[in-house]
């Protein structure tokens, strides 16, 4: 791996303010093709990408997300787990393929495929000089997103991605990640609680200092406090029901 690629990936951070400069159709096509070059399990290609250009559709999706950059960006992509085309093949096939794509394993396979495509696109966009931000907030109301985007059965909107030229006011920076030794385990998982807690305490201090410096002391919370706040909300508890309605996790 070249130093350029390494530094490009290490400098990733979410961009939430964009210039009013739409991406051209050629750029959009290149990004999608770069995404499609990602690995795909068993050549299934279990994804579709919806490019949202209509301002009225963007506005409706913004209502679901609650984030202004769903509307104000260079381009909005929505990444869809898609077994609809496989269902069409299944209708004329001799075997019952729904047993596979309607299973929990089918969901995992498809979701991984979508994530790989999206990350390929993210890196390609950043290489072009654009900023990106992922939009898991589109899952705030899956049923409404399905209606807005006219999604058929056997599809599921996983997340969006806003892309565009970063605003001159944009001053984001990469957040410190968990240290290498904490997330990389040789041969077997190291579940030593004492060691893990010790490493987390050190990481909490790093994160707290990062926020303190970035905000002139306005924010000082650490990583453990953040995940306690986020995971303690117990949001989107309807997801299993929504997945089943779309034809997933039948077994």
From Swiss-Prot:
Cofactor(s) this protein requires: FMN
Pfam families: Nitroreductase
Keywords of the record: Flavoprotein, FMN, NADP, Oxidoreductase
One example GO MF annotation: oxidoreductase activity
Keyword Amino-acid biosynthesis: no
Catalytic activity, EC: 1.6.-.-
Domain of life assignment: Bacteria
Family from the record: Belongs to the flavin oxidoreductase frp family.
Function of the molecule: Reduces FMN, organic nitro compounds and disulfide DTNB. Involved in maintenance of the cellular redox state and the disulfide stress response.
Entry protein name: NADPH-dependent oxidoreductase
Natural source organism: Staphylococcus epidermidis (strain ATCC 12228 / FDA PCI 1200)
């Amino acid at each position: 791996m070249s130093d350029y690629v390494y530094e490009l990936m290490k400098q990733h951070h979410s961009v939430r303010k964009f210039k009013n400069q739409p991406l051209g159709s050629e750029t959009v096509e290149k990004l999608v093709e770069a995404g499609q070059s990602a690995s795909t399990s068993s050549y299934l290609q279990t994804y579709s990408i919806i490019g949202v250009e209509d301002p009225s559709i963007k506005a409706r999706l913004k209502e679901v997300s609650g984030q202004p950059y769903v509307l104000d960006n260079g381009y909005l992509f929505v990444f869809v787990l898609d077994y609809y085309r496989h269902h069409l093949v299944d209708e004329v096939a001799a075997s019952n393929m729904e047993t596979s794509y309607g299973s929990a394993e089918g969901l995992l396979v498809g979701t991984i495929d979508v994530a790989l495509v999206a990350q390929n696109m993210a890196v390609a966009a950043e290489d072009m000089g654009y900023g990106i931000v992922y939009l898991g907030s589109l899952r705030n109301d899956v049923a409404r997103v399905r209606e807005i985007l006219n999604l058929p059965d056997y599809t599921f909107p996983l997340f969006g991605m806003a892309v565009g030229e970063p605003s001159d006011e944009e001053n984001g920076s990469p957040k410190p990640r968990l240290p290498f030794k904490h997330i990389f385990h040789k041969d077997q998982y190291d579940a030593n609680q004492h060691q893990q807690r010790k490493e987390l305490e050190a990481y909490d201090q790093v994160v707290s200092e990062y926020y303190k410096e970035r905000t002139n002391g306005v924010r000082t919370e650490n990583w453990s406090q953040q995940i306690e706040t986020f995971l303690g909300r117990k949001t989107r508890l309807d997801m299993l029901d929504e997945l089943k309605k779309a034809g997933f996790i039948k077994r």
